Amino acid sequence: MTSQPSSGKGRGRNLSIDEYNVYDDAKTYYTTEDRHHNHRAGARTRTYSQNSLFKQFERLGLQKEPYRRGSHDESTIPQSRRFLIQVEPTLQSLQSQEDTDGNMQITIEDNGPKVLSLRTAASNGYNRFDIRGTYMLSNLLQELYLAKEYGRKQIILDEARLNENPVNRLSRLIKDHFWEGLTRRIDASSIEIAARDPKDWTDDPRPRIYIPRGAPEQHEYYTKVALDRPELRLDVQYLPEKITPEIVRDMNAKPGLLAVDMEEVVDPKTGEKTLRGRPFVVPGGRFNELYGWDSYMESLGLLVNDRVDLAKSMVQNFCFCIKHYGKILNATRSYYLCRSQPPFLTDMTLRVYDKIKHEPGALEFLRQSLLAAIKEYYSVWTAEPRLDPVTGLSRYRPEGLGVPPETEAGHFIHILEPYAKKHNMSFDEFVYAYNHGEIKEPTLDDYFMHDRAVRESGHDTTYRFEGICADLATIDLNSLLFKYETDIARTIRNVFHDKFEVPDDWLATNNPAASKLETSAMWDRRAKRRKLAIDKYLWNEEAGMYFDYNTATRKQCNYESATTFWALWAGVSNPKQAAAMVTKALPKLEAFGGLLSGTKESRGEIGLERPNRQWDYPYGWAPQQILAWTGLYRYGFNEEAERLAYKWLFMITKAFVDFNGVVVEKYDVTRPIDPHRVDAEYGNQGLDFKGVAKEGFGWVNASYVYGLQIVNAHMRRALGTLTPYETFMKAVEENRNKALSELV
């Protein structure tokens, strides 16, 4: 960008927006002192100077700026307009006038006049200009909150920040603010907050961290932190060597954070070597632990935004987890030690490697990541209990005992109460006895086995999985494993000269198929076998889509899910199957705002006794959109991919414009007006902010910047003007017909 002009030669010419860096991130924008002095106004004799204007307000004790009649600026001027603003009085005026429902946001649901007059910098505050409409006023609210946060009492604000193209604004916020707001690292700088657990229901909740035996340097590091800062009450524990369901259950009395990867650095203050946590991105602002498949989706957005360092760091954290905990965990808390999440490590690794392959250490990064993925494949997904030996397909089927510990026992009171009465015990007595095997209830065992499987699937919750999840060979999981097999085969063949040695410390000892020397042929054969099994058990020719297969009943299920498109993402479908899905499945699953999680018919009727589930109709989720777009593009269905991406991006942008910059975890893709409103369990993450959103939601942020790579330039311009897809396509068709008619 061009630096700010000096007070000499450049004063008289028209200045572009870029020359004033008006789209700088908030920290730069509001902490650059020179920006907020009014160099641009020429001398005037009949007006306030900037300082005297503000001082006069203070002398008069005014909380609102005095209004001057007949001194409005023209609506158009040759250069970008700027405003002289007193932050606190303007913020109070704005909120009292426009935030009529008092939720510290300005939305289309507020019924204020939707106009506020601001003093212009070009007139030294003498003239005013009206800011109109929900979008500009809500942007003003957000900018004032940010200015206040950075300690500014008065600012010169560029109008361009208020009427910025919403696609550009949201993209900029994601890149400059949201990723930063969602980035965490686990070390002394953050352990007090990160190690505290809102799901710690014990009598003495305190920060606690578990260190694997293979990382003694981390145990030494955190022990020193605990000794140096006794006020933290930090409990540093070694993790047991062998992790079993019984050990995990007993650890629930002392739940804690699990250590992730650290790097050796030199402390700039002392000059001594120390450890620093490798950073990672969390799903939402209230989280502090590393999550599983959220991290993959986030990495796609990070790579678009050139945050390769963060995406690489997250891969390294995953490798640490596989090496020391045996798997990529649902999240890095002790009660998740038996549970994984949908596996995406090979694709994540290869995307990062493609960005860094010319850097020193890139090949070693790829080697370590491949070792981790191979170990995870053997020890988690193709071993008991997740492998179904009959079909050769895999299931979400984590080990575990008793009631899932991250939920309050009361969450399952309707399930457990009858059993407590049956055994003539109090609720708490029964839960303890059942969890510790003192009472045997096979029906409850099955219920919680399926409940754990739903949570491992990442699709918690949905009627697709209720009461059967652990028995299902799903199209989503088996597509991901097919992708592992083809990725590993290709990488061994093309990068490691078709011989890949596995050292003893990376060998999966619980699976006889694991080898010390891996070749591409071994993995090619696995991929072919899995494709044959997927075609036999999961593909439905008549329906033109994939369904889950119940390994207990030996029958194909009939729930129509957007995960059918994961097969396109993984490359498991043949061209005929891909075309059938576009013809038959896509019309059933496409809605106003993109892809539905499932069809209305598959969900069934809902009511008081059968409430909405968040992974069912009418909700849409970022991962389903991303994988479908990528898969459709892979098979040449570019127009369909662009259409779905446009609808999703339009819905997010419209909610962002109408509802004070909101970006949430999931959307009701059937609602044109307020799709961020979700009436299902768990509510919606990303709604609860005051004034300005700081984080958005991880995988939705990623879907936005990734989706903008899918749509074409014409579509992006139309999104910036909030043009609905049908209106856009009608205009495109009219232009096309006009162009055809003009051809000779």
UniProtKB/Swiss-Prot annotation:
Subcellular location: Cytoplasm
Binding residues for Ca(2+): D99, D101, N103, Q105, D110
EC number: 3.2.1.28
Record GO terms (molecular function): alpha,alpha-trehalase activity; calcium ion binding
Matches recorded under InterPro entries: 6-hairpin_glycosidase_sf, 6hp_glycosidase-like_sf, Glyco_hydro_37, Glyco_hydro_37_CS, Trehalase_Ca-bd
Pathway: Carbohydrate degradation
Natural source organism: Neurospora crassa (strain ATCC 24698 / 74-OR23-1A / CBS 708.71 / DSM 1257 / FGSC 987)
Cofactor: Ca(2+)
Domain of life: Eukaryota
Induction: Induced during recovery from thermal stress.
Single GO BP term: trehalose catabolic process
Annotated residues for binding of substrate: R286, W293, D294, N330, R339, S340, Q341, E406, R455, G458
Family to which this protein belongs: Belongs to the glycosyl hydrolase 37 family.
UniProt keyword annotation of Calcium present: yes
GO cellular component, one term: alpha,alpha-trehalose-phosphate synthase complex (UDP-forming)
Stated name of the protein: Cytosolic neutral trehalase
The protein's role, per its UniProt record: Hydrolyzes intracellular trehalose to glucose.
Main localization, broad class: cytoplasm
Reaction(s) this enzyme catalyzes, per UniProt: alpha,alpha-trehalose + H2O = alpha-D-glucose + beta-D-glucose
Annotated catalytic residues: D460 (proton donor/acceptor), E665 (proton donor/acceptor)
